């Protein structure tokens, strides 16, 4: 489902929804697109399409999302951590980083002298 002419005042632009949904929001330049994308409480995934790899890297770095896809979407591998920023999750699934949810690190120093 594609929603066109979406503005940031609309509920569909501000809440995390799941399913095959695309909300199209107009922007003037790359910096505005990043501001719009980051101006929400969620940050599970983001996608960037660009012919300019330098721009794609800059935008991917600036986006506050746990996963950023460049010129693709929904690529995954069990060895790569998956999870979101902000209210889109706590911790990471997949990979060794997922173990952090189930373990607590402790340091103990003992002087045996």
Please provide the spans of the model-predicted regions:
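Conserved C-terminal structural/oligomerization subdomain of aldehyde/semialdehyde dehydrogenase
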Residues: 1-113
């Amino acid at each position: 489902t594609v929603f066109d002419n979406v503005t940031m005042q609309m509920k569909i632009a501000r809440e995390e929804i799941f399913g095959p949904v695309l909300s199209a929001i107009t922007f003037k330049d790359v910096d505005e697109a990043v501001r719009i994308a980051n101006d929400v409480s969620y940050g599970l995934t983001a996608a960037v399409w660009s012919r300019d790899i330098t721009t794609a890297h800059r935008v991917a770095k600036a986006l506050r999302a746990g996963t950023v896809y460049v010129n693709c979407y929904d690529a995954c591998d069990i060895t790569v951590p998956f999870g979101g920023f902000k209210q889109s999750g706590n911790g990471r699934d997949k990979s060794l980083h997922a173990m952090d949810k189930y373990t607590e690190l402790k340091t103990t120093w003992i002087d045996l002298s």
